[in-house]
Each structure stands twice: as C-alpha cells, then as structure tokens.
Regions:
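Bacterial N-terminal signal peptides
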Residues: 22-36
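Transmembrane beta-barrel domains of Gram-negative outer membranes and organellar outer membranes
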Residues: 41-313
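N-terminal secretory signal peptides that target proteins for export/translocation
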Residues: 1-22
Length: 313
C-alpha cells in the first residue's frame, strides 16, 4: 500500500531497518486483508449509501478528493498536537478555525486562522516557551479534476498560501510566508465499504525570526497513503502511512532529514451535518542527514495527533 523510494538526495542515506519497515507496512496490510475478508462477496455491488460518503476527512492526516456539492458551506475546527523531541519536554497544540464554501462541484475556497499553544522545556536547540500565539492565517483553493463517481478515481489539486506570525516548531515570533501544494487522489475499492487515498505535498516556506533577524528558507516534501473502511453506518476506521522529507532551501536544495509515520484513523458523522475525525501518527523510522540515528527528531516530532470537528450546511 505504501512504497518508500526517493532516488534524488543531497546526502547518502542508510537503509531503513527491515524491522522498522515491516512494522510500518504491517498495519495497512492487515487493514486491507480484514476489509476484503469482511466484505467478501460485496465487490461489484454498489451499496445504497456509497454515493453519500464524503472522503475528505475519513483518512486522517491524509485527505480525500471530495470538496462538497455546489453551494455547500462548512465550518471546521482542526487541532493538531505535536509531541516528543530529545532532551526535554516538547508539547504543542495548534487549532485552525476554517470556513469553506463550494462555488461549484469542482471549485472550493476556504479561509482559516490558526492559534497555537507551546509548552517547551529543556529541548535541544529550542528556547523554553510556555505561551499561546496566533500562528498563521491562510486560504485554500481546491480544484477537482476527476469525480470519483464518474472516473476510476477522484483527483483534486489544492493550493494553500499562508502568512505566519510564529515559528511552527519553536513558537518564536516570526514573519513567515509560504504555501502548500497538494495532489489528493482517492478510490472506492469496495463499493460503500473500503476507500483508499494517496497524497503528494510540497511546502516551501521563508521565515524571518524577529528576535535574531535570521532568515530561514526550507521546504517539505510529503507522500502518504491511507485506507478507511466503513465498519458500521457512518463510522470509518483505517490506517495511514506518511513519509515526510525536510530540505534546506525553497527548491528542495539540501536534504536535511526524513521521517516515516504510521497510525490509526477514525471518522464518524452525526445526522446529515456533523462529523468528527481523529488520527494518531507515530514516527517509526527516520534519519537526520549525516546521522546514524533511527529517528529524525530534529526536523519532526515523535507523535502527531489530529482531531477535527465540523458541520456542513
């Protein structure tokens, strides 16, 4: 389900330990086998409610291609917790409040503001900080190229420029400009029961730290895959795997490190309007450029947790 292979690199990398990769792949393989077994005989028969599944948030950090029907409005609170760095205690939680509007079945705009809380003590290379801050504001434009109901898979392009006021990792006051470009694809594997998604993302950022005046230019390249199975009406459970690579420079210039995350996902709807989704990602393998360590906790965190709640109108 998930393949890790990047051929261009600025530094030589050692191979991931075979055990780590096995642990990363095993949960998704098991999810596929359980889904296929429990849905034996269902292939080729479209469930009555299959057309009602909105896949955008059923996969966790990975996202589906759906953007809502023309005229649909959505309000959403999306909280992401980042935990675990070497040398001390590292805990941050960022909550984005977002409003979305679908102008057509193929185009949607949204705007959001993100507030973050930092609780950092004794972490190597990061100043101690315990405070809340306005982290960023942004807007997101999504263009759906293929509708899953009329094509072999759904495909949506997303562009999200943002203006930041605090460094995402350290919380230090900053002037930040960046954008995230994403390709979101999904497919219905077993009608009404099992869905799969695949994402590619590229996020360049320029950050000027107000305290020191230092300017940082960096970029992140990500690839992710996920499965979600409807285990009862309006309730989905699944698993996802993501590989994130950090670079120094806006154009993927110098490789800095990478992390492989895996974890479970959950999604449920309540009535016709309300939904909740949750995901937990654990870094099971990573590598800092030039290091022999088994994780990259310089550029990434050990644990990522996401909780979304929203309403559609």
């Amino acid at each position: 389900m998930f393949s890790y292979c990047w051929s261009v690199r600025a530094f030589p990398l050692r191979k991931a330990p075979r055990g780590a990769l096995s642990r990363a792949i095993l949960p998704i393989v098991l999810a596929v086998l359980v889904a296929i077994s429990s849905a034996h005989g269902a292939a080729g028969k479209r469930a009555d409610n299959s057309g009602e599944v909105d896949t955008e948030h059923i996969f966790g950090f990975t996202e589906g291609s759906d953007i809502g029907e023309a005229g649909e409005k959505e309000l959403e609170a999306d909280s992401t917790g980042r935990f675990g760095k070497p040398g001390g205690s590292y805990n941050t939680v960022a909550t984005a409040l977002e409003a979305k509007y679908s102008f057509s079945d193929r185009f949607r705009l949204s705007a959001n503001a993100t507030v973050a809380y930092y609780d950092i003590t004794g972490v190597n290379g990061i100043d101690d900080r315990r405070q809340a801050a306005l982290q960023s504001v942004s807007f997101d434009a999504r263009f759906r190229l293929f509708d899953r109901e009329h094509a072999p898979f759904g495909l949506t392009l997303s562009v999200e420029p943002h203006r930041g006021f605090a460094d995402e990792m350290s919380g230090e006051p900053a002037d930040q400009y960046g954008a995230e470009f994403r390709v979101l694809a999904d497919r219905e594997l077993i009608p009404g029961r099992l869905f799969a998604a695949f994402n590619i993302s590229y996020e360049p950022e320029q950050t000027r730290l107000r305290g020191s005046g230092e300017t940082l230019r960096e970029s992140t390249l990500g690839i992710g895959a996920a499965l979600a199975m409807q285990v009862m009406p309006n309730v989905f459970i699944g698993a996802e795997a993501r590989n994130l690579r950090h670079y120094d420079g806006l154009g993927l210039n110098g490789f800095g490190g990478q992390a492989l995350y895996i974890g479970p996902t959950f999604y449920a709807t309540f009535g016709a309007r309300y939904f909740i989704s949750a995901a937990w990602n654990v870094q099971v393998w990573g590598a800092v450029a030039g290091s022999s360590g088994a994780l990259d906790l310089d550029n990434f965190e050990r644990h990522l947790v996401k909780l979304r709640v929203g309403a559609r109108f």
